[in-house]
Every structure is written in structure tokens, then in C-alpha cells.
């Protein structure tokens, strides 16, 4: 799909890698740690993941080991699951190796982009997708938590904050199969792109077109509002191959590390 309106390849890559760093919506207990070459989130109330991450790290080689150790120890002491993104602009060059030596586990990720023009849907009437509001946020949160193996309580509290946010940049989507809740996804809207995240389909409903339908619904949301591009950080082993078949272009590959 065309993404030719961007002037340079660097501009496209920045939209994929830098813009999503501002996708977070902080909870009252979220600590945002930001300085030149560093962006980190710490949220003690979300122990199983979410708003606990190093989103950007460009470290001086001489201080890298100390910063890595301090960061890992912070999350360990608080008992938090976290992630560390090692994108193309991360430093030092061997940052991924340093994290791996400390026992963090990587998964390969594709930074992808697509225009928001529509894709054909073949799921039929059995599959529906709806935007989530106050009436369905509990059902959405329960489905998301089941899909990701998380406690639904903190997730629901966060999602209620999302739908109540006056900025309205974050949107939640619930997919159903024959009326049963079966999958979830979300997006964050920026000026030139929407950032896709949180897509999951429950195992019992996979292979029925629900993931495609969630992608299509979010593309339609963006297109109707004149937002020309969609971006995503997709797992190489799961969603990236599907998204490539749906017209997303991979601009870069990079690891994201987790502590379990």
C-alpha cells in the first residue's frame, strides 16, 4: 500500500518508531522518567505489564551497564513485568546483547506501516467489531485479560480511564463471533498516523477472520477521520505475517526484551 506522501525514508521510519513512544496514557501512579536519550514508564499498579517499559534508550557506552542494572533492579524490586524496546536508534550498538546476558528474553518485532485505505473482509455476518464504551468496557477488559493471561481488575481500571479521557486519542475495539466476545484491539491517534496495539484473539476463535476484522475496523476509523497512515510494532511470530498479507510494509526489525 502506498506510503509515498512521506518525503524521505527517514521520515517514514520516525513515524513508525518515534511517534508511538507518545502512545501512553498514564495512570495516577505512573512515573514517566524522561531525559535526553531515555524514556521509561513505571506503573506499580499494573504488575503484569502495561505502562512498564523502557521505550527509548540511547546510552553512553561507558554508563550503559550501570543504567541497565539499575533499571532491571527497579522493576525487580517492585515485582513488575516490563519490556525494553531496542529499536534502530538504540545505543550502544550491543545493547541487545547486554540485555540478553542479564537474562531478559527477546521477541523479534517488525516496525510496519500502511495507508489507511480499506481492505476486503471475508468474515461474513458471524464476525462483528464494535467500538468499546462504558457499557462494554468490562466485557472488553475480561476478553483482553484472558487473551494475554493477565488479571482483569487492573486492566479494567485502566480501560475505564481510557474511555473517559477527554483527549480521545485512545480507542478500544471488541470483536465478536456469533455475539460471543472473541478478540480485542486498540489504537492511539496522532496527526498523521494511528498506532495499532493490543490485538489478540482468544484461541477458541482463531482462524475465523477476527484479527483481519479488527485491522479493518481500525483502518476504517482512521480513514473516516482523514488520518492517512497506520503503524504497528508486530511480533514476527504471530501478527507480522498476517499484516504483510494485508498490505503493511516492514520498515525495520528489532527485538523487544521482557523479564518473563
Please provide the spans of the model-predicted regions.
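Acyl-donor-binding surface of acyltransferase catalytic domains
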Residues: 62-138, 232, 239, 255-259
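Short amphipathic alpha-helix that is part of the acyltransferase structural core
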Residues: 1-20, 55-56, 61, 110-111, ...
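N-terminal charged segments
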Residues: 1-76, 91, 154, 164
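C-terminal appended segment following the main domain
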Residues: 216-260
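A conserved beta-strand-loop-helix scaffold within acyl/acetyltransferase catalytic domains
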Residues: 152-204, 252
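Conserved acetyl-CoA-binding loop-helix of GNAT-fold acetyltransferases
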Residues: 64-72, 201, 207-220, 224, ...
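A conserved beta-turn-beta hairpin within the catalytic core of GNAT-like acetyltransferases
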Residues: 46-53, 107, 189-197, 206
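Conserved beta-hairpin
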Residues: 31-36, 88, 94-105, 170-183
Amino acid at each position: 500500500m502506498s506510503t509515498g506522501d512521506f518525503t524521505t525514508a527517514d521520515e517514514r521510519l520516525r513515524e513508525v518508531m518515534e511517534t508511538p513512544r507518545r502512545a501512553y496514557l498514564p495512570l495516577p501512579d505512573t512515573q514517566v522518567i524522561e531525559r535526553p536519550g531515555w524514556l521509561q514508564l513505571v506503573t506499580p499498579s499494573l504488575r503484569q505489564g502495561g505502562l512498564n517499559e523502557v521505550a527509548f534508550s540511547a546510552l553512553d557506552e561507558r554508563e550503559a551497564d550501570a543504567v541497565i542494572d539499575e533499571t532491571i533492579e527497579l522493576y525487580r524490586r517492585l515485582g513488575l513485568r516490563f519490556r525494553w524496546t531496542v529499536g534502530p536508534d538504540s545505543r550502544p550498538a550491543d545493547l541487545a546483547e547486554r540485555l540478553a546476558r542479564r537474562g531478559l528474553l527477546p521477541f523479534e518485532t517488525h516496525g510496519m506501516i500502511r495507508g489507511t485505505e480499506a481492505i476486503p473482509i471475508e468474515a461474513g455476518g458471524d464476525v462483528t467489531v464494535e467500538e468499546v464504551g462504558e457499557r462494554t468496557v468490562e466485557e472488553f477488559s475480561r476478553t483482553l485479560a484472558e487473551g494475554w493471561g493477565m488479571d482483569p481488575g487492573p486492566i479494567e481500571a485502566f480501560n475505564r480511564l481510557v474511555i473517559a479521557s477527554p483527549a480521545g486519542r485512545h480507542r478500544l475495539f471488541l470483536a465478536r463471533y456469533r455475539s460471543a466476545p472473541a478478540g480485542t484491539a486498540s489504537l492511539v491517534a496522532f496527526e498523521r498516523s494511528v498506532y495499532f496495539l493490543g490485538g489478540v484473539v482468544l484461541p477458541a476463535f482463531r482462524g475465523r477472520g477476527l484479527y483481519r476484522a479488527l485491522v479493518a475496523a481500525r483502518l476504517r476509523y482512521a480513514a473516516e477521520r482523514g488520518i492517512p497512515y497506520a503503524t504497528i510494532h508486530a511480533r514476527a511470530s504471530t501478527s507480522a505475517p498476517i499484516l504483510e498479507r494485508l498490505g503493511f510494509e516492514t520498515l525495520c526489525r528489532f527485538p523487544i526484551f521482557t523479564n518473563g
